[in-house]
Amino acid sequence: MSGQKPIYRRILLKLSGEALLGKEAYGIDSSVLDQIAEEVTAVHQMGVQVAIVIGGGNIFRGVSGASRGMDRSTADYMGMLATVMNALALQQALEKHGTSTRVQSAIDMKEVAEPYIRRRALRHMEKGRIVIFAAGTGLPFFTTDTTAALRAIEMGAEVLMKATKVDGIYASDPKKNPSALRYDRISFSEVLQKDLKVMDATAISLAKDQNMRIVVFNLRKKGNIKKIVLGKCIGTVVEGCDHAQ
């Protein structure tokens, strides 16, 4: 089904920190940030309620810090703080486009963000505000992908949209294998069994338990967010039933 009427009433968009890099080696590319804000605003103006979970890998990755000998918990907390920086930057970009936005942090820092309160987040969305969830789950050892699955379920989102650099889920790395099979649809069980690295196993398992549909798509192709919301076949859909390829 496709058309000009959204098929989703409420979505959760997962953005990696790396998505904000653009052509930069570190930090945030302001032109990329503005493009994301423009696309999200366009969807929001269609009456779709939007929540966002953002990573921090463009600034600091907890796993990378731990691999260099840092205590894993400390490294993960540093990564969570990086997500707050990204969330504030995205909030600023969205509000420049006239979109009222709130940041909720799983780590208390009342000077810059609201604490994460589920009912308040729901109320914000009902009032037409975008909500950005920062600081992951607030706990070490959990990825922002797992946070995205958790928040999507808590918010009652109808779909979790996972933004990536490629146009879906492949059987192998398309950069190393240009003829790699791309899935149009795949089940949660298949993703886990085939150990496909689109999201970590905890995130996929959580989505599977609650039958939270995931759409994996290429953020770099302008207009993809809107196309998915309108029901067009973009990227790879991950859902409950097994699909023959």
Swiss-Prot record:
<keyword id="KW-0808">Transferase</keyword>
<feature type="binding site">
    <location>
        <position position="76"/>
    </location>
    <ligand>
        <name>UMP</name>
    </ligand>
</feature>
<protein>
    <recommendedName>
        <fullName>Uridylate kinase</fullName>
        <ecNumber>2.7.4.22</ecNumber>
    </recommendedName>
</protein>
<keyword id="KW-0067">ATP-binding</keyword>
<dbReference type="InterPro" id="IPR001048">
    <property type="entry name" value="Asp/Glu/Uridylate_kinase"/>
</dbReference>
<dbReference type="GO" id="GO:0033862">
    <property type="term" value="F:UMP kinase activity"/>
</dbReference>
<feature type="binding site">
    <location>
        <begin position="137"/>
        <end position="144"/>
    </location>
    <ligand>
        <name>UMP</name>
    </ligand>
</feature>
<keyword id="KW-0418">Kinase</keyword>
<dbReference type="InterPro" id="IPR015963">
    <property type="entry name" value="Uridylate_kinase_bac"/>
</dbReference>
<feature type="binding site">
    <location>
        <position position="56"/>
    </location>
    <ligand>
        <name>UMP</name>
    </ligand>
</feature>
<keyword id="KW-0963">Cytoplasm</keyword>
<feature type="binding site">
    <location>
        <position position="57"/>
    </location>
    <ligand>
        <name>ATP</name>
    </ligand>
</feature>
<comment type="pathway">
    <text>Pyrimidine metabolism; CTP biosynthesis via de novo pathway; UDP from UMP (UMPK route): step 1/1.</text>
</comment>
<dbReference type="GO" id="GO:0005737">
    <property type="term" value="C:cytoplasm"/>
</dbReference>
<feature type="binding site">
    <location>
        <position position="173"/>
    </location>
    <ligand>
        <name>ATP</name>
    </ligand>
</feature>
<dbReference type="InterPro" id="IPR011817">
    <property type="entry name" value="Uridylate_kinase"/>
</dbReference>
<comment type="similarity">
    <text>Belongs to the UMP kinase family.</text>
</comment>
<keyword id="KW-0665">Pyrimidine biosynthesis</keyword>
<feature type="binding site">
    <location>
        <position position="61"/>
    </location>
    <ligand>
        <name>ATP</name>
    </ligand>
</feature>
<keyword id="KW-0547">Nucleotide-binding</keyword>
<dbReference type="InterPro" id="IPR036393">
    <property type="entry name" value="AceGlu_kinase-like_sf"/>
</dbReference>
<feature type="binding site">
    <location>
        <position position="164"/>
    </location>
    <ligand>
        <name>ATP</name>
    </ligand>
</feature>
<feature type="binding site">
    <location>
        <position position="170"/>
    </location>
    <ligand>
        <name>ATP</name>
    </ligand>
</feature>
<comment type="subunit">
    <text>Homohexamer.</text>
</comment>
<comment type="function">
    <text>Catalyzes the reversible phosphorylation of UMP to UDP.</text>
</comment>
<dbReference type="GO" id="GO:0006225">
    <property type="term" value="P:UDP biosynthetic process"/>
</dbReference>
<feature type="binding site">
    <location>
        <begin position="14"/>
        <end position="17"/>
    </location>
    <ligand>
        <name>ATP</name>
    </ligand>
</feature>
<dbReference type="Pfam" id="PF00696">
    <property type="entry name" value="AA_kinase"/>
</dbReference>
<dbReference type="GO" id="GO:0044210">
    <property type="term" value="P:'de novo' CTP biosynthetic process"/>
</dbReference>
<dbReference type="GO" id="GO:0005524">
    <property type="term" value="F:ATP binding"/>
</dbReference>
